[in-house]
């Protein structure tokens, strides 16, 4: 089939339609758009997708492409085999005569002595969601007579192993993806490099980053030199930073005439014979290596071109540029796909705003689907409204990357609240605290307190009144319960107030008369006035416990091990009860050998029905689920199943206990912790008993320790009851999804998670669901793959503060020590707690931990987590079990591998990698993919 039957095989950049991705591919379309807008793009044309269709029009090739689409992304060997078959088929193909003539005719528009850049341009590359950088071929310095062959090679590179695997992982159809090819004369560049119109290291959309080197950009793209690196503020044109790199070589076009003199270097390698054009590598003189490539004025000019490209193409751009004859030209432009999305909606006041990740605060930083985000945004808004703070916050929450962020700008703009927030949040998540401190220190003008204006006075009066009305009724109960705790009359596990608290949360949803009303009630579930009046007094002794814990830590700063010990060994603690319950289940299985054998062989609960002793085990298991079946991993994400729905993780823990422990070991462990706590308390009392007032101090410390232990053990009880509410909300919303399935509005009940709140309400009121659920599922999957920052600004900057741990071993990872002690062992990296177990003696390495991870702590000897703080769940459990722990370790699950030996110091907050660590990406400097000798793009 001739290309002309479907469209021209060639489109020049200036021609209408060349900016169409379906015609010119991503790279070609972007260059055409820039050229048509008047930006400096070297003259060139695109061999279009019509030519690609001409090349692949063969039943054998189409069959192989369809076979690729039918394969699973995990079948890498089969994918590679079919891809190799396709490349072989394409290498034996030729363009039709009409297509070949069209391309060769276009080439006559250039000088015969020109050499060319031949760049692949797939229809699925250089898109906002998928860049395909480094997946397809690019050839530089190509002689005119070889262009046609290189075009065929570029089209065949659509099926390189890496390109096929990338499309398969990202759910992109191979049959729907086509290849165009960009043809341009090579630019004889004095300098070249890469411009990022947003800083890729921080995400700041108002800072551009430039890498620059002498000669062609190939040396930078290939990673062969350390380029100059500059940062420019695009609002003020200020050059914020210019670092001169060590540029040992330059790559230049091969010219017979005085090329060495122009570069003032020595030729060290010739990539192609002189008569074929091509490039060569030049070794630069010592002075040249250390000299600046670009002046400040040149930087500003280049950044201005980048801003125009970003505005035209609608997203921050990764631009390859060259400087020739004193003028900049743009060689390529594609979206920066690695940036974390900018928070939305933007601030209404036009000023800098700072947002804190709700997920990081809850030790659950993963993305959540749209409806779940709406639940928590509504919840936060209602809480602020009840406190009278809604007017002060504007949009109290924003979204970015499938996460909810809380606007803390109002706190940071107040001199007293600023320090209070930064100090208090340090115990929850140290990176958030240091991030807030860093942005306040770096941008003080944004957080200057401007006083209370006359116009704002009514708002302050209203806020004060609401706070008094909200907290006032709770004050007597708070005082009464704290005094009761101090007198030894603290809450007990049998106190019905705990279940009443859960009943309050659950009943506000389940008591509604209809499924529609119950779904709406989820978004109104917390009556904050009633919460403060009835619930806050019950949990107030917990604040006393935290205060006493802080006092003990400060007073006995030289005895951290003993202070940690008195905070564990509680049989009544929720976490301990969960683990004791799982251990008891293993003992039940041991008492029935056939059950134990079946479980070791991977039996499910249903499989045990006909096994001798199986019913006894099932009854015990159901008793456990009656108490804890509403728990699960990532509990604040209502879309995730609970243990009652999917008990496979619990059964895996029981299997591990059967394999690695004897009967009663789990209860012996708790008894040892109780004994350790009593011994530690005695030692702390002895430390206090010195001098004339020693006996009095001893009694005082004994009283404080008793009060601390009588109150701190119930720290997980509020979460236990809150999780009951979350499960009720989940059930109600899934029921609403089922209702919409019955009406033909949704395909599956869990599609409901991909609706927005207003869309759900409209559908329940009889409206039509006009939503692309599949697209939202794909967007959610992309969000899940992103690493979210704990602090982000309205400018898109991911703010990271520095934690000073003093001298640390080279290569050590630094985080926050939350449970003292040192342990050395093999790492077990787990990202999904439902699909893995920890073997005895291993150190658990996780992205985050919440109550759903609790069973995995049974066999662990230490914890490393990417997220968390001193009072996060993982820290509490680690201290309860006496495990050294370091949290808030950036990229821990990427930089540590399973089986690697590590040394964990929970006192200093460091993790030493004792085996050779895996290579990692340097966050401070982003490098482009390394290329083959002919270039890969």
Ranges and model annotations:
Residues 341-713, 717, 728:
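N-terminal, non-catalytic alpha-helical interaction modules of very large eukaryotic scaffold proteins
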Residues 22-54, 116-147, 186-230, 317-339, ...:
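Conserved phosphate/anionic-ligand binding catalytic regions in large, soluble enzymes, centered on
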Residues 1-182, 191, 288-311, 506-509, ...:
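N-terminal beta-alpha lobe that positions the nucleotide/phosphoryl donor
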Residues 255-280, 918-936:
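Intrinsically disordered, low-complexity terminal tails and inter-domain linkers enriched
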Residues 223, 298, 305-373, 550, ...:
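Cysteine-dependent phosphatase catalytic core of the protein tyrosine phosphatase
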Residues 133-166, 189-270, 331-387, 862-864, ...:
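Extended active-site and interfacial segments that coordinate phosphate-rich ligands
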Residues 47-95, 241-247, 252-255, 831, ...:
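A structural-propensity feature for long, helix-poor, extended segments
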Residues 58-62, 302-305, 316-317, 325-341, ...:
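Acidic, glycine-rich flexible loop/linker segments
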